[in-house]
Amino acid sequence: MKHQRGYSLIEVIVAFALLALALTLLLGSLSGAARQVRGADDSTRATLHAQSLLAVQGMEQPLVPGQQQGSLEDGHFRWSLDVRPYDEPRRNAQAPVDPSAPTLLQLTLVVRWGEQPNQRLLWRTLRLVTATAQGNPA
């Protein structure tokens, strides 16, 4: 009786099953990594847009309380800006206010690029604005 050399059909099937399982796990990892890279790219671009939007506030037009909104990159990023006087918690409410004194404004910028809660950035900053920059004569 001769001994057969080679692999049996069951051994080949088991090898293919293990290979398929390994490829499935590998592709799942690559898919997750690609999703994380895409999310990091969107977050980085949103941060750059937010910095640019905040940098130009008060440059072309005087900074006044109100709301603005818009979109960037063909609507991929949507932003809204809320400008309001800063409410100083330690300020005495009865203290007289000099109309020619500079005003502190709080800018709240929200940049969104999706519907998920982690697909938005919220920036808050303060700007000191002179009375003449607000349109009030000094």
UniProtKB/Swiss-Prot annotation:
The lineage of its organism: Bacteria, Pseudomonadati, Pseudomonadota, Gammaproteobacteria, Lysobacterales. Cleaved by prepilin peptidase. Methylated by prepilin peptidase at the amino group of the N-terminal tyrosine once the leader sequence is cleaved by prepilin peptidase. The modification N-methyltyrosine is found at residue 7. GO terms for cellular component: plasma membrane; type II protein secretion system complex. The keyword Cell division does not apply. This is Type II secretion system protein I. Residues 1-6 form a propeptide. It comes from the Bacteria. Type II secretion is composed of four main components: the outer membrane complex, the inner membrane complex, the cytoplasmic secretion ATPase and the periplasm-spanning pseudopilus. Interacts with core component XpsG. One of its GO terms (biological process) is protein secretion by the type II secretion system. InterPro entries: N_methyl_site (IPR012902), T2SS_protein-GspI (IPR010052). PANTHER family: TYPE II SECRETION SYSTEM PROTEIN I-RELATED. Belongs to the GSP I family. It is found in: Cell inner membrane. Keywords: Cell inner membrane, Cell membrane, Membrane, Methylation, Protein transport, Transmembrane, Transmembrane helix, Transport. Pfam families: N_methyl. Component of the type II secretion system required for the energy-dependent secretion of extracellular factors such as proteases and toxins from the periplasm. Part of the pseudopilus tip complex that is critical for the recognition and binding of secretion substrates. The chain crosses the membrane at residues 7-29.
